[in-house]
């Protein structure tokens, strides 16, 4: 059994008052494993419990960031959380190092998808191959 975000145990047994199915609360373990494998050597192995721990941490992180963005939207009497709100909440919660790269990514995404709501993407020139922090592996190729 694993402990849920609210401190209650989630396990088999099915009662109706639980938080929901684990697969509904977590990103798919296969996706977590695929992302983790990018950070270890080719011959490296990742234990199942490591993937499960990261899966829980990722879900908690998403809830943490989204909750702050949701509070902001409530104060502004808006019903929809957008990418700008999530980036704002990351800066507010101490993840400032990610704010500028995420703003850049969001701008490029919006330009590619043709969605410029809430942004000034059309005012900024776009560079199609952008490299972040001098790391060619972190570029947005083909955008």
Curated annotation (Swiss-Prot):
Read off the InterPro entries from this record: CBFA_NFYB_domain, Histone-fold, Transc_fact_NFYB/HAP3, Transcrpt_fac_NFYB/HAP3_CS
Tell me, in one coarse class, where this protein mainly resides: nucleus
DNA-binding region range list: 27-33
Query: What does this chain do?
Result: Component of the NF-Y/HAP transcription factor complex. The NF-Y complex stimulates the transcription of various genes by recognizing and binding to a CCAAT motif in promoters. May regulate the expression of photosynthetic genes, and may be involved in chloroplast and amyloplast development.
The subcellular localization recorded is: Nucleus
Bias class Basic and acidic residues marks the residues at 117-130
The record's listing under PROSITE patterns reads: NFYB_HAP3
Which gene produces this protein?
Answer: NFYB4
Name of the protein: Nuclear transcription factor Y subunit B-4
Q: Which UniProt keywords apply?
A: Activator, DNA-binding, Nucleus, Transcription, Transcription regulation
Q: Does the keyword DNA-binding apply?
A: yes
Where does this protein have compositionally biased stretches of type Gly residues?
9-20
Q: Which SUPFAM superfamilies match?
A: Histone-fold (SSF47113)
Its GO biological process terms? regulation of transcription by RNA polymerase II
Q: Give the Gene3D superfamilies listed for this entry.
A: Histone, subunit A
